[in-house]
Amino acid sequence: MTALPRYAVFGNPVAHSKSPQIHRQFALQEGVEIEYGRICADIGSFAQAVSTFFGTGGCGANVTVPFKQEAFDLADEHSERASAAGAVNTLILLENGKLRGDNTDGLGLVGDIVKVQNTEVEGKNILLLGAGGAVRGVIPVLLAQNPARIVIANRTRAKAEEVAARFGIEAVPMADLNGGFDIIINGTSGGLNGQIPDIPPDIFQNCALAYDMVYGEAAKPFLDFARQSGAKQTADGLGMLVGQAAASYALWRGFKPDIRPVIEYMKAL
């Protein structure tokens, strides 16, 4: 009996990940069976965990917090998106045995904001909260939409300034933020611990969309705060998750899934 194609998501923590359910839905659309698991790699042992996975028959992998920049360093070659971001969320095993790193986070985010949340990015003022691999991954695709400006703010100011310099955007200390943003995107992971970024509530006064890149309960603290502070519309990152997963699946298998029924399926769980 032929072994099923095997995929996985690497992270720490990763037990909460919905990626296995999402990719099973994609496989049903394609009419195939696959294996898709969760691998919690120890901090400091990510490279070894990836090597073991691909060395024992793995076909492709997703990478989540906190390993996206390590995945970039590990990949033998990179897509333009990944090179621009300096972060990788998708590893593809090539026929020559090398690993290609790609980044589909930005595709998932922009696709959800524009197509599902019906909010244009072009010509808008955008605030990004956080400066980690997740945020780096979405900036190139956001810039390609021609926003009026992108501002980045982070708890550690130097990290925000480093990212801003890399992409030619603005960095502002969190405490100095004021209104004027159409779209505010939270890319910090504090919601996993029930925390929100240390930001003034009045930045949401003219905000058309407050978006958290995480999903479910972890997004609730930020989105509740945004709503109470005046944001007109809020959304968690479920659509982004499904969208980036669909782009990864297409890179691995050459089949492009329809994300809308999968988003509805995940909401119903």
Swiss-Prot record:
Q: Which organism is it from?
A: Neisseria lactamica
* HAMAP family with a match to the protein in the record: Shikimate_DH_AroE
UniProt: shikimate binding residues: S17, K18, S19, T64, N89, D105, Y215
- In UniProt terms, what function does this protein have? Involved in the biosynthesis of the chorismate, which leads to the biosynthesis of aromatic amino acids. Catalyzes the reversible NADPH linked reduction of 3-dehydroshikimate (DHSA) to yield shikimate (SA).
Q: What class of enzyme is it?
A: oxidoreductase
Signal sequence range:
none
Give a yes or no for keyword Oxidoreductase in this entry.
yes
Matches recorded under NCBIfam families: aroE, PRK00258.1-2
Which InterPro entries did the record assign? Aminoacid_DH-like_N_sf, NAD(P)-bd_dom_sf, SDH_C, Shikimate_DH, Shikimate_DH-bd_N, Shikimate_DH_fam, Shikm_DH/Glu-tRNA_Rdtase
- Look up the record and give one Gene Ontology term from the biological process aspect: chorismate biosynthetic process
Q: Indicate what this protein is called per its UniProt record.
A: Shikimate dehydrogenase (NADP(+))
Q: Which residues are listed for NADP(+) binding in this entry?
A: E80, G130, A131, G132, G133, A134, N154, R155, T156, R157, A158, K159, M213, G237
Family designation: Belongs to the shikimate dehydrogenase family.
Per the record, the pathway is: Metabolic intermediate biosynthesis; chorismate biosynthesis; chorismate from D-erythrose 4-phosphate and phosphoenolpyruvate: step 4/7
Superkingdom of this protein's organism: Bacteria
Catalytic residues at K68 (proton acceptor)
Q: Which GO terms describe its cellular component?
A: cytosol
Q: Name one Pfam family in it.
A: Shikimate_dh_N
